[in-house]
């Protein structure tokens, strides 16, 4: 399921992040991937240890927590703290697949933890007219889908998808990216639950008979109970 979620960040908030990132110390993005990824990755990335990455990442997590659509679509169990990248002229990232299992930051009790990447997320931090190229291109069984969204908007898609970032030919593309392990492993099941949840919300808003809504809500929670992993 490829889903555009608008206005995770307000325009003012996205602009504020751009301004703070402008003064950041960026590193070569190839330092964060293995030999295969390094052959096709040409961008800059904010270091994992950067206090700014942690500060802005927490702001994004707080914003996501305020989005009912994001929660309904992802049903998050674990989220990798948001990271940040920058594409300047001639930067690009060729087709690649995200790692299936990722390490989470070590907990205070030093217990190691990991995340299964079910959902890949890109949050755009500047507007499309500020750069040329730089489209996120996601390949699935229906072909290739180009994504280039306004500042503050989020795209989510299955982490099983091959994807790339097209070459930037003018300006600069700035974004945050992160991964989610969902309560529901299968993308088709998540899609069905989102469709059902959306229908329930629509019926509730139209003052449909309460018993009808209750029965559908019961179906939703029973499906979630059957499909969820905690």
Curated annotation (Swiss-Prot):
This is PKHD-type hydroxylase PD_1553. It comes from Xylella fastidiosa (strain Temecula1 / ATCC 700964). PANTHER family: PKHD-TYPE HYDROXYLASE YBIX (PTHR41536:SF1). Residues 78-182 form the Fe2OG dioxygenase domain. Gene3D superfamilies: q2cbj1_9rhob like domain, Rabenosyn, Rab binding domain. GO terms for biological process: DNA damage response; intracellular iron ion homeostasis. Fe cation binds at residues 96, 98, 163. It is an enzyme of class 1 (oxidoreductase). InterPro entries: Oxoglu/Fe-dep_dioxygenase_dom, PKHD_C, PKHD_hydroxylase, Pro_4_hyd_alph, Pro_4_hyd_alph_FE2OG_OXY. The keyword Oxidoreductase applies. Its cofactor is Fe(2+); L-ascorbate. PROSITE patterns: FE2OG_OXY (PS51471). 2-oxoglutarate binds at residue 173.
